Amino acid sequence: MNIKDLRVVKTRASINKAFITLFFEKDFDTISIKEITEYAQVGRKTFYLHYIDKYDLLDQVVSEKLTELEEICEAKKHLGLQEGTQLWFEFFENNRSFFMKLFNISNASSYKKKLLHFIEEEFKKKVPTTVATDKGLDYHLYINFISNGMIGLLDSYLNSSDNTQEQEKIPLHVSRLLSLYDLA
């Protein structure tokens, strides 16, 4: 199917919009293809031309979010650690509702693993192996440790109260923590 075809683009956008709306209104496990297609005003057959099932649709929505995050990471690579971390957390703040909901669905662990892999790959681009090996540490274990810490901090950030002052401090604390590991 030609992804550049305007009809395809509009249909996918309609399905995605319907899905996101339902995703915020209902528990993911209770969303049906019928509801998505009715809300998107497309037939079930049309839905299945674009997606295998609702899990495939969610996977593609998550992939789009990670692509956005990758673009932010690329844009921030010339910034200092604190400024770059601030941009990163702004992305998650702007998508807070989505990620809070995503991390609380029944198969959330697979999406956390996907995000973990993304974070590991970003660190591998920026952290030379000597940072770990000079300390007698295994590089992959080092990257995995830091990346899992980021997932934990991100989870805390997303689930923290609406205390704006505390939320504003998190990127600063993250950049300071990363500097402890020679990642500044």
Regions found by a protein language model. Name each.
Residues 23-26, 134-138, 155, 159-161:
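Cytosolic nucleotide-binding catalytic cores of signal-transduction proteins
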Residues 9-20, 24, 29-33, 38-41, ...:
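An amphipathic alpha-helix adjacent to DNA-recognition modules
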Residues 1-8, 184:
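N-terminal intrinsically disordered/low-complexity leader segments
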Residues 148, 159-184:
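C-terminal peripheral helix-coil segments that are non-catalytic and often amphipathic
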Residues 87-116, 155:
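Amphipathic alpha-helical segments used for helix-helix packing
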Residues 108-133, 137-151:
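Amphipathic alpha-helical packing segments from all-alpha helical-bundle domains
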Residues 1, 44, 77-81, 88-90, ...:
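Primarily secretory-pathway and cell-envelope proteins
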Residues 73-76, 99-102, 130, 157-161:
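Secondary-structure edge/capping motif, primarily at the C-terminal ends of alpha-helices
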